[in-house]
Amino acid sequence: MARIAGIDLPREKRVEIGLTYIYGIGLPTSQKILEVTGVNPDTRVKDLTEEEVNSIRNYIKDLTVEGDLRREVALNIKRLVEIGSYRGIRHRKGLPLRGQKTKTNARTRKGPKKTIANKKK
């Protein structure tokens, strides 16, 4: 099993798809990595030679992925909250940041509905 950036890549998948299991690498980045390293995207992860795995590892070493990327994103959000920007306030309140309406919907960001009991008349 190929282990790259601390992640065990699934053996049966194509390398192109297997690399996307690493946080911070999507399909376009995966394709670029394989193009630069000269690895065939249709190769299965289990069929990679040690030389190919090392060339992929060396390329990914220069990218910000996994823990470093997660930390960077968390610090960016923390900075927004600390400076009190609009986006930081929305993060703090757990609301959508990018101008979506919140009268209805926005349930993913707001969480389950908090129902209010009707008053007796």
Swiss-Prot record:
Residue numbers spanned by region Disordered: 93-121
BP-aspect Gene Ontology terms: translation
Source organism, top-level taxon: Bacteria
A cellular component term, taken from the record's GO annotations: cytosol
InterPro entries: Rbsml_uS13_C (IPR027437), Ribosomal_uS13 (IPR001892), Ribosomal_uS13-like_H2TH (IPR010979), Ribosomal_uS13_bac-type (IPR019980), Ribosomal_uS13_CS (IPR018269)
Organism expressing this protein natively: Clostridium perfringens (strain 13 / Type A)
Function: Located at the top of the head of the 30S subunit, it contacts several helices of the 16S rRNA. In the 70S ribosome it contacts the 23S rRNA (bridge B1a) and protein L5 of the 50S subunit (bridge B1b), connecting the 2 subunits; these bridges are implicated in subunit movement. Contacts the tRNAs in the A and P-sites.
Keywords: Ribonucleoprotein, Ribosomal protein, RNA-binding, rRNA-binding, tRNA-binding
One Gene Ontology MF term: rRNA binding
Subunit structure: Part of the 30S ribosomal subunit. Forms a loose heterodimer with protein S19. Forms two bridges to the 50S subunit in the 70S ribosome.
Family membership: Belongs to the universal ribosomal protein uS13 family.
UniProt protein name: Small ribosomal subunit protein uS13
